[in-house]
């Protein structure tokens, strides 16, 4: 190791190199207001019995204790009372047996992969892959492993059952020909003024094919057969669409207004990408490595959501610029993580007295550094351009959850939302959200109601993100320990193909995968039965079945690999050495997904750039959906965060009347293709069509997702 490398290594462990390391952002007055809100009595309506009796008359305390549940809630009957506990114990016993069988099945699959498939040169290449610390070196090692396993031939072949390669072939050919015609017109001028310009035909083509998961090109299975990249045809489609969008943006034959309407249409159809960070106590520090990998490769989405421990990481990311994050996401950051610094006797006495292990005010003080003091969601967006979302659950079990962001709660203080999202019963008592008033002082938010851990109901708020920000592509970093134990992709995951049969087999063989799926689904079934029959106990007034039955995955799911010692340190601060390992593991788990994310953001960023350049107001431009929602809220708030875009959202208008020429071009190109595997004639045979449809497979990863698990 050279002297420069040794110096760089020392720097990443030196806390003095961290920006704002010694700075305390929190204002003591803010903490006092927060303490006052926490100690405020619960609001209770006072209603007199009648006009002559007092409101609070003295009555003797009844000796009869109030039942835990009312009959109206549980619909008690004779059979319910008699069969409840025997049925509950029987189901729990069966789930225990299934859990033991599941452990044996996973052990068999692990031994099968370790001692049957990973041997010889394949094992050596895999070890080299796991030792890489940056993406470029990792990519070279992944390509070497793909070459050895013969995966390059799979990339060169167009046919695959999980996407429509025939449609993609035709679209690529049409885009290429129309783009070349548009480039010729831009250089030499139009030859015939009666015909519409080629760039308009290109816009029609793009409006037809720039959609979320068009023809299956964003199916994760397309990236699950190799360690790097995807089908050559899919990559060609992504590159061609990007080139065509750039040509439309640079064209002088279309006005800025028409371009803006065009990009609004594309943005609505294509949607947005969001990064979702799960909870998981100190397991959430693996998110730092995931963030660092995405940041170093310029694929960090603007929309970020976090829950519980993931909310702390998301708050750090949303309140810092890229340059600040690159300096912060190093092992020295462990010196600022001091949430669990108290001794055993201190927290035991507190837990016995208050029912919570940690002190809320101390956590508020520690958390404020990660959130840059009492920064609000609106202020964080104005500073970095990132949209922070934090999932919070009300302490009242009958109230809906909230996804706090700069649209739903713009003046809410971030550190209060992070504390609320991390308030697990028994660990931290429910807290009050705080809002910043115009004079800069803090006050209780939402009438002083208290909130708790968002993971209890909505660890990954996919539906709320789609509602507020048109998100339809989610990157989930999942570190919940109780979920990681049951994570298993029988056909491989993005950048992690199956270890044998050149990635086309089943993990542990078909029988091993079938047994694993059956046992896991059976356990899930019995938990749902207990929940729907209202048989599950509710410790601390919480339905704990949601921590198992909600959806925890996304379009891309990143699963950092934990080790047994992480469970021992689940409620303790990391040392710089342990955080360094978690950073490395987090980056390693994100490297296989980067090419998929790059392809997605390549088109999305081009669309956003078009909105940016073609907008009349300039400045930061949001997507049309965000713009429309922001305009609605601007009528209620005098302080505007960005310049208002036009509130109308019309369909794209074009002066192009005669579409016969475009139809002729489309029909002519449908019969030909530059790719070798496209049939020369139009499919007209019924038997040929039936054969083609029978060869199409669908990704069933979301088939068993609970539709009611994620609320807004």
Curated annotation (Swiss-Prot):
Motif (GXSXG): 306-310
Biased composition range(s): Basic and acidic residues: 1-13, 632-646, 652-664, 677-687
Species of the source: Neosartorya fischeri (strain ATCC 1020 / DSM 3700 / CBS 544.65 / FGSC A1164 / JCM 1740 / NRRL 181 / WB 181) (Aspergillus fischerianus)
Keyword Zinc: no
Domain PNPLA: 275-466
Region described as Disordered: spans on this chain: 1-21, 628-687
Sample GO molecular function, one term: triacylglycerol lipase activity
Signal sequence interval, chain numbering: none
Gene3D superfamilies in alphabetical order: Cytosolic phospholipase A2 catalytic domain
Function: Probable lipid hydrolase.
GO CC entries: lipid droplet; membrane
Enzyme class, UniProt record, top EC level: hydrolase
Transmembrane segments: 85-105
Bilayer topology term: Single-pass membrane protein
Keywords on record: Hydrolase, Lipid degradation, Lipid metabolism, Membrane, Transmembrane, Transmembrane helix
Residues annotated as the enzyme's active site: 308 (nucleophile), 453 (proton acceptor)
Family statement: Belongs to the PLPL family.
GO BP, sorted A to Z: cellular detoxification; lipid catabolic process; triglyceride mobilization
Keyword Magnesium: no
EC number: 3.1.1.-
Chain segments annotated as coiled-coil in the UniProt record: none
Subcellular location(s) of the protein: Membrane
PANTHER family, alphabetized: NEUROPATHY TARGET ESTERASE/SWISS CHEESE D.MELANOGASTER, TRIACYLGLYCEROL LIPASE PTL2
InterPro entries according to UniProt: Acyl_Trfase/lysoPLipase, NTE, PNPLA_dom, Triacylglycerol_lipase_N
Protein's UniProt name: Patatin-like phospholipase domain-containing protein NFIA_019760
């Amino acid at each position: 190791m050279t002297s420069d490398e040794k110096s760089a290594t020392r720097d990443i462990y030196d806390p003095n190199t961290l920006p704002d390391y010694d700075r305390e952002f929190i204002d003591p007055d803010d903490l006092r207001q927060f303490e006052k809100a926490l100690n405020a009595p619960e609001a209770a309506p006072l209603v007199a019995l009648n006009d002559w009796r007092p409101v609070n008359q003295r009555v003797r305390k009844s000796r009869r204790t109030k039942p835990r549940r009312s009959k109206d809630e549980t619909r008690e009957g004779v059979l319910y009372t008699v069969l409840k506990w025997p049925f509950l114990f029987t189901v729990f016993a069966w789930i225990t047996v299934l859990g033991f069988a599941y452990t044996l099945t996973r052990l068999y699959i692990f031994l099968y992969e370790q001692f049957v498939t990973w041997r010889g040169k394949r094992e050596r290449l895999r070890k080299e892959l796991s030792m890489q610390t940056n993406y470029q070196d990792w990519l070279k090692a992944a390509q070497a492993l793909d070459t050895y396993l013969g995966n390059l031939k799979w990339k060169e072949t167009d046919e695959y059952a999980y996407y429509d390669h025939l449609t993609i072939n035709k679209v690529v050919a049409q885009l290429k020909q129309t783009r070349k015609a548009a480039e010729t017109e831009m250089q030499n001028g139009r030859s015939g003024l009666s015909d519409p310009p080629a760039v308009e035909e290109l816009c029609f083509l793009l409006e037809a094919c720039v959609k979320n998961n068009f023809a299956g090109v964003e199916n994760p299975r397309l990236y699950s057969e190799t360690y790097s990249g995807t089908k050559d045809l899919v990559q060609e489609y992504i590159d061609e669409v990007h080139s065509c969008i750039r040509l439309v943006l640079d064209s002088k034959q279309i006005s800025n207004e028409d371009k803006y309407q065009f990009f609004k249409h594309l943005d609505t159809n294509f949607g947005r990408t969001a990064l979702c960070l799960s909870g998981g106590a100190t397991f959430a520090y693996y998110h730092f490595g995931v963030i660092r990998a995405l940041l170093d490769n310029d694929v960090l989405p603007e929309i970020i959501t976090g829950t519980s421990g993931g909310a702390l990481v998301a708050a750090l990311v949303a309140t810092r610029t890229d340059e600040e994050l690159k300096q912060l996401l190093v092992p020295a950051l462990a010196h600022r993580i001091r949430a669990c610094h108290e001794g055993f006797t201190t927290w035991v006495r507190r837990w016995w007295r208050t029912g919570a292990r940690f002190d809320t005010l101390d956590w508020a003080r520690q958390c404020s550094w990660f959130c840059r003091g009492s920064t609000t969601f609106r202020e964080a967006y104005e500073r970095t351009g990132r949209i922070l979302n934090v999932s919070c659950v009300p302490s009242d079990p009958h109230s809906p959850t909230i996804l706090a962001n700069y649209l739903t709660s713009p003046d809410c203080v971030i550190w209060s939302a992070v504390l609320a999202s991390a308030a697990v019963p028994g660990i931290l008592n429910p807290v009050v959200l705080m809002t910043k008033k115009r004079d800069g002082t803090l006050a209780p938010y939402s009438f002083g109601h208290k909130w708790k851990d968002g993971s209890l109901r909505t660890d990954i708020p996919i539906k709320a993100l789609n509602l507020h920000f048109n998100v339809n592509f989610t990157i989930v970093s999942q570190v919940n320990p109780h979920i990681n134990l049951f994570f298993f992709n029988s056909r491989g995951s993005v950048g992690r193909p199956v270890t044998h049969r050149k990635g086309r087999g089943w993990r542990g063989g078909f029988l091993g995968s079938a047994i694993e799926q059956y046992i896991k689904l059976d356990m899930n079934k019995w938990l749902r039965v207990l929940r729907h029959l209202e048989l599950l106990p509710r410790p601390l007034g919480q339905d704990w079945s949601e921590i198992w039955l909600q959806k925890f995955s996304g379009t891309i799911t990143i699963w950092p690999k934990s080790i047994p010692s992480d469970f021992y340190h689940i409620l303790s601060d990391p040392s710089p050495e342990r955080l360094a390992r978690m950073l490395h593991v987090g980056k390693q788990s994100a490297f296989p997904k980067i090419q998929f994310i790059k392809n997605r953001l390549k088109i999305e960023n081009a669309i956003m750039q078009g909105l940016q350049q073609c907008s009349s107001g300039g400045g930061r431009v949001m997507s049309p959906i965000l713009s429309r929602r922001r305009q609605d809220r601007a009528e209620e708030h005098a302080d505007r965060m960005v310049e208002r875009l036009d509130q109308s959202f019309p369909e794209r208008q074009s002066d192009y009347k005669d579409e016969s020429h475009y139809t002729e071009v489309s029909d002519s190109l449908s019969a030909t293709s530059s790719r070798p595997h496209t049939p020369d004639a139009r499919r007209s045979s019924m038997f040929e069509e039936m054969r083609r449809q029978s060869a199409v497979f669908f990704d069933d990863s979301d088939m068993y997702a609970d539709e009611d698990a994620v609320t807004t």
